[in-house]
Amino acid sequence: MADSKQAPLDAEAAAKAAFASVQDRPFPDDIFTAPELRWAVIGCGVIANQMAQSLALAGRKLAGVANRTLSKAQAFAEQYGIEKVYETVEDLYADPDIDAVYITTPHNTHITYLRAALAAGKHVLCEKAITLNSAELDEASAIADEHNVVLMDATTVLHMPLYQELRRRMDAGDFGRMNLAQLNFGSYKEYGDLTNRFYNRCLAGGAMLDIGVYALSVMRLFMASQPAEVVSLGNTCETGVDVAGGIVCRNAEQQLGVVSLTLHSKQPKRSVISFDKCYIEINEYPRADHATIVWTADGHREEVHAGTEAYALCYEMADLEKAVAGDDSKRELLGYASDVMELMTKLRADWGVVYPEEE
C-alpha cells in the first residue's frame, strides 16, 4: 500500500492557520445534515491528518485507518482516537462496520483502491486527482453503479458552499451571460530534487494532476457545457512530467476558459469569471469562502461570503453522506469531475505526458 501523498507546504501552513481561526467557534449545525456514516481512511499523510483534524472540530472521528506502514497507521490512530487499525486494506474492505472509505494515497494508486473498495460495497471519497485518466474514472464509475454505491471526487471546489451560492445566482440570471473564465495557479517547487512527487513520473507527478485540476474544475463549474475546443502549450521536464501550461477552451455557447499553470513560479491562485453584468474575483480559490463581485453598471463591489475555509474537508465528507441519503445534486458532482478528467487526459496527451501505468 502506498503512503499518502504530501500536500504543498504553503497549503499545509494555510490549513493550519484556517484551523486555528475556528478552534474556539461552535461547529456549524448545517454541514453534517445527513445520517452519519462510519468512515475509514487509506493513507495517513498530510491530507488525511487534515481530515481527522477537520472532523475533530465537528466532534466526529474516523472509525478506521489503513496504511502501507502499520506503525504509521497505529500512530495516526492513537493521535486521533481511531478505534480500528487494519493490517491490510483487504481487512478494511471486509469490515462490515465500515460504510465509507476516504482514499488519500498518490494519484497513480487510486484506481487500485477504488476497484477494490467499490466492489466491496463501500462508498468512496477519493482525493484529487481521482484517477490518472478518463478510462480509469469511467471504470470506477461503472463499478460504483454496479454495486449501488457512491463515488465522489474530493476536489475541494466541487464542495465549497461559495461555489454553490455563486452558481445558484448565476443560474437565476443575476450575473447575465458568462463570457470568460480566467484562472492562474503557480506553485514554486524546488527543481533540484527530481525524485520528489511533483516531478516524479512514477508517482504521477506534474502540474496538471496536482494543481490544474483545481483551475479546470472552477472553469467547468461556471461554463454552461463541456468545452469542445481545447488548444494549449505545455512544458515538460527531463522526467517526462508537465511543469507548466497555457490552456484556452471554448464550448458550444462560445464561452471561453483561459488557464495558466506552473510549478516553477509562484502565481496568485486567482480566478476572474466575467459576465455581462459583472465580474467575480475569487482569490485562493481551491478552498475559497469569499468572492468579490464588481458590477459593470456602476462599479460597486459586493462581497459574498459562504462557508468556511477550515471546514473544506468536512464539506466533502458531508456531500458524500448527503448523496448516500438520496441527494441527487451531490451525486451529480461526479459529472463535473468526469468532464475535468476528460480535459486533463486530452491535455496530457497533447503534451506527451504518459505515466508508466498508461504505457
Question: Where do the language-model regions lie?
Answer:
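C-terminal helix-rich "cap/oligomerization" subdomain common to oxidoreductases
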Residues: 1-33, 100-102, 252, 319-359
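N-terminal Rossmann-like dinucleotide-binding module
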Residues: 2-80
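Beta-loop-alpha module in the N-terminal Rossmann-like domain of NAD(P)-dependent dehydrogenases
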Residues: 51, 69, 80-142
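Hydrophobic residues in well-ordered beta-strands that form the structural core
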Residues: 126, 151-153, 282
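Rossmann-fold dehydrogenase core element
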Residues: 139-156, 177-181
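Predominantly a Rossmann-like dinucleotide-binding segment in NAD(P)-dependent oxidoreductases
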Residues: 157-230, 238
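NAD(P)-dinucleotide binding in Rossmann-like oxidoreductases
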Residues: 235-242, 251-321, 328-335
